[in-house]
Amino acid sequence: CAEEMLSLIEGAEMVKFGKNGSDVTSAAVRLARAYTGRDLVAVCADHPFFSGDDWFIGSTPISAGIPKVTQELTVKFSYNPIESVQALFQQYSGRIACLILEPEKETAPVDGFLRKVQELCRKNGSVFILDEMIWGFRGHRGGGQRYHQIIPDLSTFGKALANGFSVSALVGKREIMRLGGLEHEQERVFLLSLTHGAETHSLAAAMEVIRIYKREPVIEMMWRAGGGFGKGGRESICEHSFPDHFKVFGKPCC
């Protein structure tokens, strides 16, 4: 399954499988903190959910039970205004371990936003993470990163990966990912340990999904079906005079 996964994602050199999205986004954050020796995590304020773990939930309105010191380790930026990202790196110079965002949500990147974010991460020594839970296996076979022609340091996948089976994946560059293994002399990272981690049905499902994606026009079908659904939705909204209450947004595939 690892070989099948890596064959799809350009620039990915290693993969670690989990069971849900929070498993792998939190693992990505741990790796980034270990790799950089920094504590702060920058998250996109316009993307609603990255993890059920403290590092993210502590930055939301439902943060009861999470220590203040943990909440203060997550900072936010806005999607598309590159000045928002620049301001964070200036305010927290040398302190940001990683930056995480989705390739896009209902708003597409403009003026080379994703590439500019990547350049800022490189310039400031921070790990660039793309959360592909929604875009992965929907917008492009190689994810939103392939669609937008950008290679992150780490990226996370799930949802459509196994067509509903419980599996997620963290993929990325070897120099970062290897810290979650045993073959290095640096301080070890406790990457993932899951109660049902040895369950293999979901991995078998993921393997078959990837094989189907390689031989069938699944992505094209989703774009067509989503386009038809969106068109019908907009027509129905106008027909019933609901434009102030409902709207259709985002890419047809998602």
List the predicted regions and their residue ranges.
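Conserved N-terminal phosphate-binding loop of PLP-dependent enzymes in the Aspartate aminotransferase
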Residues: 1-254
